């Protein structure tokens, strides 16, 4: 019987794409990248997103450190445009990590589904995001008060989809995997990781990604979770 609901944060509750995009446009303007050969913010964002995803994959695989990720993603983006300026990359990286968590765009129906679920279940977060950043996001977006435990990969010592982070989460809460459901947008990290550990899972799948995993439900809007819980 499900008693505890674990949510992913980025791209599930907190709209990472919108918040990140808006901050990157701001940084393109603030650091006058148009004067350095990057004529449109969309060019900057397109290349950054590709490089950032590659860096996050390396970080999840423990191939680079948190500090490497923060340094390389902007340095490599600028280098793509022929800008070899370590200080500029460091400055942009610092501004991004400092400012982006204060942006508060959430997915539709976040508070509606939280209000529905919290009367029936205990709610928690499991996230691969950085400890200090995720807590700021949640506080600024008025999410913190709704969740009993906020499990970060840094605190758990492992990143999703590794079973260690799910083991840490259920031990922290004091339940078994069978009592839990994981809700997230990442098919590998959130859904496959949780299912392999023995949890049930609901796939937040707004882009209608096809898959063969045995899940409790697929939803394109968070409010649809009501049909399964």
Please provide the spans of the model-predicted regions:
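Short, conserved clusters of charged catalytic residues that mark active-site
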Residues: 108-109, 164
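Asp-based, Mg2+/Mn2+-dependent phosphohydrolase catalytic module
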Residues: 1-5, 17-18, 115, 130-229
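N-terminal helical cap/lid subdomain that shapes the substrate entry/recognition surface
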Residues: 2-108
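Catalytic-core regions built around general acid/base machinery
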Residues: 109-120
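Conserved phosphate-coupling serine/threonine residues in phosphotransfer and NTP-handling enzymes
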Residues: 127
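A generic structural signal for short
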Residues: 62-63, 102, 123, 154, ...
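Glycine-centered short loops/turns at secondary-structure junctions
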Residues: 120-121, 198
């Amino acid at each position: 019987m499900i008693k505890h609901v674990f949510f992913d944060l980025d791209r599930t509750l907190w709209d990472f794409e919108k918040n990140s995009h808006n901050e990157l446009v701001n940084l393109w303007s603030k650091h006058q990248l148009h004067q350095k050969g990057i004529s449109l913010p969309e060019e900057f964002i397109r290349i950054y997103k590709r490089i950032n995803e590659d860096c996050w994959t390396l970080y999840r695989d423990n191939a680079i450190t948190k500090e490497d990720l923060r340094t390389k993603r902007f340095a490599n983006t600028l280098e793509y445009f022929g800008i070899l300026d370590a200080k500029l990359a460091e400055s942009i990286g610092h501004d991004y990590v400092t400012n982006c968590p204060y942006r508060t765009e959430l997915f539709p129906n976040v508070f509606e589904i939280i209000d529905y679920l919290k009367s029936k279940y205990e709610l928690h977060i499991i996230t691969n995001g950085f400890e200090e950043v995720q807590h700021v996001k949640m506080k600024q977006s008025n999410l913190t008060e709704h969740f009993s435990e906020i499990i970060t990969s840094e605190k758990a010592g492992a990143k999703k989809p590794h079973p260690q982070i799910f083991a840490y989460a259920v031990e922290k809460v004091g339940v078994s995997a069978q009592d839990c459901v994981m809700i997230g947008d990442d098919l590998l990290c959130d859904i496959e990781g949780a299912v392999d550990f023995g949890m049930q899972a609901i796939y937040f799948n707004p882009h209608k990604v096809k898959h063969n995993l045995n899940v409790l439900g697929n939803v394109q809007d968070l409010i649809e979770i009501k049909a399964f819980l």
